[in-house]
């Protein structure tokens, strides 16, 4: 999770998944643990239940991989894109993010190129990013900033 303080009332974590996965296959030296997905609200990023122009700031961090098993730790933790509909799904997600964003609001889009290059994903929105940053061990995680045009 990217939040410094999940309890901060300025943060709203929404996801279509919720649950806990026990991780028992780790060696005892690494400690056994659990992965948790505990959103504040449960809904689909393609159809958010918020009114237009509700937020000053939105972070869009969709699944980055197509067809990974939801029974795997990675699939449980990050979700999976459908191999047939991923482009439409991400396109709808971008549209929803900009719909709920106030004029001059910021959208931070997080993407990992493990499966799909960022350049392909950015074609799914007519909006143009303002700037971005690469991070991660292989520099394949991108943080991309958009600013919504004024109303």
Q: Which positions does each model-derived feature cover?
A:
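Class I S-adenosyl-L-methionine-dependent methyltransferase catalytic core
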Residues: 1-151
